[in-house]
Swiss-Prot record:
Zn(2+) 2 binds at residues 68, 71, 90, 94. Required for the function of some acidic activation domains, which activate transcription from a distant site. The exact mechanism of action is not yet known. ADA2 and GCN5 function to acetylate nucleosomes, opening up the promoter region. The ADA2-GCN5 histone acetyltransferase (HAT) module is recruited by WOX11 to regulate crown root cell proliferation and stem cell maintenance of root meristem. The ADA2-GCN5 HAT module together with WOX11 targets and regulates a set of root-specific genes involved in carbon metabolism, cell wall biosynthesis, and auxin transport and response. Expressed in roots, mature leaves, stems and panicles. The gene is ADA2. PANTHER family: TRANSCRIPTIONAL ADAPTER 2-ALPHA, TRANSCRIPTIONAL ADAPTOR 2 ADA2 -RELATED. PROSITE patterns: SANT, ZF_ZZ_1, ZF_ZZ_2. This is Transcriptional adapter ADA2. The keyword Coiled coil applies. Zn(2+) 1 binds at residues 53, 56, 77, 80. It comes from Oryza sativa subsp. japonica. It is found in: Nucleus. A zinc finger (ZZ-type) spans 48-104.
């Protein structure tokens, strides 16, 4: 293999090639300060990842080497390559690449060019946010250093998303190394305690890069670098493996890694997630509109053996899927643009009738702009208000009012009278409910729990624990006080004749129960299963006397004989 690695790396060839570039110590033509810094980091990490020649096993880390483009992870030194050395399966006629030594500073004095490449490769491989793996891929930098460098040099660059290369354009390797060496020497004369602002010479809006390079603030050791990164950690969030960080007020950072986004206050309205499942950080709904759009092509794949018809069909499925995504995007943008996730301030002061009109007019939002729709709704509500006022004035004129003062008095009296009528109705309904409590039971008749005094004094029918009416007081007492049982207002009362109403009052039956008993009796009589009163007793869990009375009414209406009804 081209190098020895402490941790084996799995994955495709491209990942192996990139992982091979991981290094722990920088060597070669790098200045002493950089070598010491990288060496210190390597010793702290305790991992070795050096390149070596696959033929002579010579250490070629930090030197120019020849990399085979065909054989994976295969390197040769210049001497072995010059004599055409071959190691199975490598052959001397394989294509190759010349890998130059990149151990020189480029963007920052404390970051070499090869470390920059490893940083970007690590972010591409492990994702932006998996900084522990990225730092391990770089090998010579800590997690905090990687975050701080990427935030400063890339995210906050004036040339975003590219780093600022104006201070190195036109300079060769020797000039860059000399520049880093000068900065390393000037670091010794600087005071040890620096403020956070002085330790950020590579932030273009605050300190010019040329001045920073001249002052030599960047040639500090990794310990100082880590300390500076910790001091600036408030701009990039709290790190799990970082030390105690000091928060620094800095309004410069506009693009940062790990910064908490501002939350919506309670005054701005209900939470987005509570209303619709909208995630403001991802700008997505959960679930999305047409959430099953991806299922149509989840298992679809293009194969070389596909015919033209199959290929055209798959392309059409893709076009349909894209149109569904466009509709999903349109709806989401429409909701966010119209601010439909929060209550409209216009709706707060509306009456219930006006709110109903407001909601009915929401269907026209898709055809109008936001301003046009609000103007339409306001005009409709204003029209309703004017129409109500005109109707009130017409009623006042019909009542004989001739001035606005008289009309105002008439309207107040009318409202007062309506209020009294409503209060009287509510009082009557409350008395009715207090006298009789209706309890609905599933699949059996409704039970009536009357006041105990009425049951005892007026002969009301009581219910035993089995659901059957107790016949002890249902007889003549119920007939004597039948007028006390008023069924007016109960559902189904308007469907009964006078004789049927009297029957319900005498037997203390609800209209719905009577109609149901009548329906069942008619069906059974037509079937022939009920020929006399005793046959109907088993059909209902009520007092047999009530069943007999209902049976008599049904047979009377059918015009049949009580004992032998004709069908």
């Amino acid at each position: 293999m081209g190098r020895s690695r402490g941790v084996p790396n799995s994955g495709d060839d491209e990942t192996n090639h990139r992982s091979k570039r991981r290094r722990v110590a920088s060597s070669g033509d790098a200045p002493d300060s950089l070598s010491a810094a990288c060496g210190g980091a390597g010793e702290g990490g305790g991992k070795k990842a050096l390149y070596h020649c696959n033929y002579c096993n010579k250490d070629i880390s930090g030197k120019i080497r020849i990399k085979c483009s065909k054989c994976p992870d295969f390197d040769l030194c210049v001497e072995c390559f010059s004599v055409g050395a071959e190691v199975t399966p490598h052959r001397s006629n394989h294509p190759y690449r010349v890998m130059d030594n990149l151990s020189f500073p480029l963007i920052c004095p404390d970051w070499n060019a090869d470390e920059e490449i490893l940083l970007l490769e690590g972010i591409e491989m492990y994702g932006l946010g998996n900084w522990a793996e990225v730092a391990e891929h770089v090998g010579t930098k800590t997690k905090a250093q990687c975050i701080d460098h990427y935030t400063t040099a890339y995210m906050n660059s004036p040339c975003y998303p590219l780093p600022d290369m104006s201070h190195v354009n036109g300079k060769n390797r020797k000039e860059l190394l000399a520049m880093a060496k000068v900065q390393g020497e000037s670091k010794k004369v600087l005071p040890g305690d620096l403020t956070p602002k002085d330790e950020s010479p590579f932030s273009p809006p605050r300190v010019k890069v040329e001045d920073a390079l001249g002052e030599g603030l960047a040639g500090r050791s990794p310990s100082h670098i880590a300390g500076g990164a910790n001091k600036k950690a408030s701009n990039v969030g709290q790190f799990k493996d970082g030390a105690n960080v000091a928060k620094v007020e800095d309004g410069h950072v506009d693009r940062s890694i790990g910064v908490k986004k501002p939350r919506y206050s309670a005054d701005e309205g209900p939470s987005l997630t509570e209303l619709s499942g909208y995630n403001s950080k991802r700008h997505e709904f959960d679930p999305e509109y047409d959430n099953d759009a991806e299922q149509a092509l989840a298992e679809m794949e293009f194969k070389e053996t596909d015919s033209e018809t199959d290929r055209e069909l798959k392309l059409r499925v893709l076009r349909i899927y894209l149109s569904r995504l466009d509709e999903r995007k349109r709806r989401k943008e429409f909701i966010l643009e119209r601010n439909l996730l929060f209550p409209n301030p216009l709706e707060k002061d509306l009456t219930n009738e006006d709110k109903e009109v407001y909601h009915r007019y929401k269907v026209f939002m898709r055809f109008l702009s936001k301003e046009e729709h609000e103007a339409l709704v306001r005009s409709v509500l204003e029209e309703r208000k004017i129409r109500r006022r005109i109707q009130e004035l017409q009623e006042c004129r019909s009542a004989g009012c001739r001035t606005l003062a008289e009309a105002k008095i008439h309207i107040e009296q009318k409202r007062k009278k309506e209020h009294e009528v409503n209060a009287q109705k509510a009082k009557e309904s409350g008395q009715l409910l207090s006298n009789t409590k209706v309890v609905h039971k599933t699949n059996r008749p409704m039970k009536i729990e009357s006041d105990g005094n009425l049951d005892q004094k007026k002969g009301g029918a009581s219910l035993d624990s089995t659901g059957r009416d107790s016949p002890k007081t249902t007889g003549h007492a119920g007939t004597k006080h039948w007028d006390d049982w008023d069924i007016v207002g109960f559902p189904g009362a308007e469907l009964l004749s006078t004789s049927e109403k009297n029957l319900c009052c005498q037997n203390r039956l609800l209209p719905n129960h009577y109609l149901k008993m009548q329906e069942v009796l008619m069906q059974e009589i037509f079937k022939g299963s009920v020929a006399k009163k005793e046959d109907a007793h088993v059909l209902f869990k009520v007092d047999p006397a009530k069943v007999d009375n209902v049976y008599d009414m049904v047979t009377k209406k059918l015009g049949t004989n009580e004992e032998a009804p004709t069908v």
